[in-house]
């Protein structure tokens, strides 16, 4: 259990180090503390913090820096989120006020805005797809057994992919199956459509075709595109600014983490349950991947009422200014939720 003075000293060390990037010495710290204390006393208290693995001594300096455990203690017990500045709030509101035509445009642009505000790598995930329903599915022949499959949702999203049909598929039978799919599945949530596609729909297709596999694979592929979680990344190169290694293979692997949805899904915990919707992970708490040992991840959910919940996140060095960054993330999620709610209401009311 730390004393109040030890807590204040640890808080000051974290704030000083995240601001300057330089190890903090006892003499300088004594001058910055909000109470009068000698540098010898500060030195003794820092020794206690070091014994508790909350701060570390760097070999090249007599000063101390926070440890991962020290950052964790600071975030959990000593953090005082900084209110977003008026200037940053205006930037957020103006950037989200542009004339967007699709939800994905807003979410993608949001990642860039958040990255620019923090100078770190930012992630955004569109609201969950629970409320999105199938509006229609059709297949347009292109000739030579090639078709384009088109799926439309009630949120205005349109997914299309080109395919080559198996030569044994009868086009009349295919159109009959498409009518059956629209008759039975239009109006259902995409999650229910996915379930039906695995359960009873294949059996019904057998009334029209010898095997459901060839054609249903097409529908399944387009449906998967519409139902997938969509992460957008802003400021990819910012991640490399704080890399602790100059090994080109390690840097390539670090950059590659951002290229696959599976990686991002594992890194971004999409099951946030905290009431305030903000979560901070430090070092190995983020991932078992050692490339992220010197990074921290601030994740926040945003709620768009009945239209679902999405996620925004910032990935930066463990020595990021947590108070300011959390303040920006918190303000951003609120403004993004407002903007998306306006968009959804406009779409459904029009």
Curated annotation (Swiss-Prot):
GO terms for molecular function: DNA binding. Gene3D superfamilies: 3.30.450.40, Heat-inducible transcription repressor hrca homolog, domain 3, Winged helix-like DNA-binding domain superfamily/Winged helix DNA-binding domain. Keywords: Repressor, Stress response, Transcription, Transcription regulation. The keyword Repressor applies. One of its GO terms (biological process) is negative regulation of DNA-templated transcription. Negative regulator of class I heat shock genes (grpE-dnaK-dnaJ and groELS operons). Prevents heat-shock induction of these operons. Belongs to the HrcA family. This is Heat-inducible transcription repressor HrcA. It comes from Limosilactobacillus reuteri (strain DSM 20016). The lineage of its organism: Bacteria, Bacillati, Bacillota, Bacilli, Lactobacillales. The gene is hrcA.
């Amino acid at each position: 259990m730390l004393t109040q003075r030890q807590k204040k000293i640890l808080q000051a060390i974290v704030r000083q180090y995240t601001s300057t990037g330089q190890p903090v010495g006892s003499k300088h710290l004594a001058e910055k503390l909000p109470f009068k204390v000698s540098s010898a006393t500060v030195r003794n208290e820092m020794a206690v913090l070091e014994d508790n693995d909350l701060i570390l001594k760097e070999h090249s300096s007599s000063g101390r820096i926070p440890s991962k455990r020290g950052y964790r203690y600071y975030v959990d017990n000593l953090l005082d989120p900084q209110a977003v500045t008026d200037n940053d709030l205006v930037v957020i509101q103006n950037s989200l006020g542009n004339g967007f035509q699709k939800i994905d445009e807003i979410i993608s642009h949001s990642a860039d805005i958040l990255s620019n505000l923090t100078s770190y790598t930012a992630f955004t995930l569109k609201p969950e797809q629970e409320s999105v329903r199938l509006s229609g599915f059709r297949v347009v022949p292109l000739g030579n057994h090639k078709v384009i499959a088109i799926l439309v949702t009630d949120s205005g999203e349109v997914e299309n992919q080109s395919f080559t049909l198996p030569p044994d598929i009868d086009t009349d039978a295919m159109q009959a199956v498409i009518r059956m799919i629209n008759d039975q599945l239009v109006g259902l949530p995409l999650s229910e459509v996915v379930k039906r596609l695995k359960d009873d729909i294949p059996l019904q297709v057998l009334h029209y075709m010898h095997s459901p596999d060839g054609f249903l694979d097409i529908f399944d592929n387009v449906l998967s595109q519409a139902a997938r979680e969509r992460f957008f990344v802003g400021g990819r190169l910012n991640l490399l600014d704080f890399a602790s290694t100059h090994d080109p293979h390690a840097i390539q692997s670090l950059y590659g983490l951002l290229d696959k949805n599976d990686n991002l899904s594992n890194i971004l915990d999409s099951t946030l349950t905290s009431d305030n919707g903000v979560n901070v992970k430090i070092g190995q708490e983020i991932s078992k991947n050692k490339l992220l040992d010197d990074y921290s991840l601030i994740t926040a959910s945003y709620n768009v009422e009945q239209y679902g919940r999405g996620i925004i996140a910032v990935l930066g060095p463990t020595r990021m200014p947590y108070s300011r960054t959390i303040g920006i993330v918190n303000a951003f999620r609120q403004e993004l939720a407002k903007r998306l709610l306006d968009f959804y209401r406009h779409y459904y009311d029009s």
